Amino acid sequence: MNFSAVILAAGKGTRMYSNKPKVLHTLAGKPMAKHVIDTCEGLGAQNIHLVYGHGGDQMKAELGEERVQWVLQAEQLGTGHAVNQAAPEFADDEKVLVLYGDVPLISAETVENLLDAQPTGGIALLTVVLDNPMGYGRIIRRNGPVIAIVEQKDATEEQKLIKEINTGVMVATGGDLKRWLAALKNENAQGEYYLTDIIAAAHDEGRAVEAVHPVSPIEVEGVNDRAQLARLERAYQAAQAQKLLEQGVMLRDPSRFDLRGTLQCGMDIEIDANVIIEGNVTLGDNVVIGAGCVLKDCEIDDNTVLRPYSVIEGATVGEECTVGPFTRLRPGAELCNDAHVGNFVEVKNVRLGEGSKANHLTYLGDAEIGKRVNVGAGVITCNYDGANKFKTIIGDDVFVGSDSQLIAPVTVANGATVGAGSTVTKDVNENELYISRAKERRIANWQRPTKK
């Protein structure tokens, strides 16, 4: 569909009590404005003009300077003035869609309906009926068709009784929009150039104005403070949870589940309470996720169990694995099939072979670990000398005793055993027992120091 979009994002957001622009506050882990940009890109917008006024450098850094055409509104003189800053870029014959960076839940379906509804030479306007329309511009109709929009501060008492309100979202043809914007005046209670005044201008020219309702009213709710943002967050999460339930995912408590990215699921997934999904996560069949787990940009294969309060980021977990509780898998961690990683184990940039186990209180970093290896409690791969990192290689069928330190670079060959409490500084040969311990000392009749 041939259209361009204008996203208004110049407001200060003073009620957010924040140093960053309002539209950069996140919903589901993503800046509000990015939700709107993604919707436009998904529908194939030819150009996306983002009108900003405050924190331009910060906005460009977070939203991506190349994704949109940046339009500065140096003075905030109203919505009509804001759109007019981008008007020189509009093609005369293209559809121009006006959206808002602080209205993040607008759906692709609603936008498509609005674009399709635009009458030739006229305007398609998104409206909604509210039980309490206080503060919103009212839709004025005459025998059915929309003829004008009156803002709350300019409305008569009779007009204030109208419950159909303007959302601000609309579509018009570029050439018409430029002409109507150029003719706007600020003769109103707020001394601003209202975008809504183009409705009356279109009517005066005999152009049709078609009103369209959103798929869901929550889509057009804006954010002015943190309470409103929290409300939209809960609405968004409830919708995501409902979709997953309908796809067969068992959410033990849908109200305590957060999806802040994308989730691809197999069959018979079980997710307990307070689980957070971030980035791109893929789950195979029969995966069970315990309470309080956080998953980000990871893949979990079939029949794997993630026990409570495990954090997995940038990792790959194979089939039939057990992780947790209280495990941290960091970027580059790869657990092969039937691997076990237990409580208070941290793994980074490590391949843990099939059937291998590290069940207790262990740090594994920058290591290649073979099959059927047992890593005892308190084992540390010492991979960093303060400037550089080094690799530990452990072969198949190795047993590493508790409280051992492996000082990289070092190799422990197939079948070797490292005795508990050892500090391994040299390579260990196949099927060798390596023990490194200080000589014991015993002092009879020892008296502990006492306070004087």
From Swiss-Prot:
Molecular function as annotated in GO: glucosamine-1-phosphate N-acetyltransferase activity; magnesium ion binding; UDP-N-acetylglucosamine diphosphorylase activity
Region called N-acetyltransferase, residue ranges: 248-452
Cofactor(s) recorded in Swiss-Prot or TrEMBL: Mg(2+)
Localization: Cytoplasm
Binding site for Mg(2+): 102, 224
Location (main, coarse): cytoplasm
GO cellular component terms, semicolon-separated: cytoplasm; membrane
SUPFAM superfamilies: Nucleotide-diphospho-sugar transferases, Trimeric LpxA-like enzymes
Binding-site residues for UDP-N-acetyl-alpha-D-glucosamine, renumbered to this chain: 8-11, 22, 73, 78-79, 100-102, 137, 151, 166, 224, 330, 348, 363, 374
Catalytic activity of the protein: alpha-D-glucosamine 1-phosphate + acetyl-CoA = N-acetyl-alpha-D-glucosamine 1-phosphate + CoA + H(+); N-acetyl-alpha-D-glucosamine 1-phosphate + UTP + H(+) = UDP-N-acetyl-alpha-D-glucosamine + diphosphate
UniProt xrefs under Gene3D superfamilies: Hexapeptide repeat proteins (2.160.10.10), Spore Coat Polysaccharide Biosynthesis Protein SpsA, Chain A (3.90.550.10)
Alphabetical list of PROSITE patterns matching this protein: HEXAPEP_TRANSFERASES
Pathway the protein contributes to: Nucleotide-sugar biosynthesis; UDP-N-acetyl-alpha-D-glucosamine biosynthesis; N-acetyl-alpha-D-glucosamine 1-phosphate from alpha-D-glucosamine 6-phosphate (route II): step 2/2; Nucleotide-sugar biosynthesis; UDP-N-acetyl-alpha-D-glucosamine biosynthesis; UDP-N-acetyl-alpha-D-glucosamine from N-acetyl-alpha-D-glucosamine 1-phosphate: step 1/1; Bacterial outer membrane biogenesis; LPS lipid A biosynthesis
Region (Pyrophosphorylase): 1-226
Keywords: Acyltransferase, Cell shape, Cell wall biogenesis/degradation, Cytoplasm, Magnesium, Metal-binding, Multifunctional enzyme, Nucleotidyltransferase, Peptidoglycan synthesis, Repeat, Transferase
Family recorded in the similarity comment: In the N-terminal section; belongs to the N-acetylglucosamine-1-phosphate uridyltransferase family. In the C-terminal section; belongs to the transferase hexapeptide repeat family.
Function according to Swiss-Prot or TrEMBL: Catalyzes the last two sequential reactions in the de novo biosynthetic pathway for UDP-N-acetylglucosamine (UDP-GlcNAc). The C-terminal domain catalyzes the transfer of acetyl group from acetyl coenzyme A to glucosamine-1-phosphate (GlcN-1-P) to produce N-acetylglucosamine-1-phosphate (GlcNAc-1-P), which is converted into UDP-GlcNAc by the transfer of uridine 5-monophosphate (from uridine 5-triphosphate), a reaction catalyzed by the N-terminal domain.
Record's protein name: Bifunctional protein GlmU
Organism this protein belongs to: Aliivibrio fischeri (strain MJ11) (Vibrio fischeri)
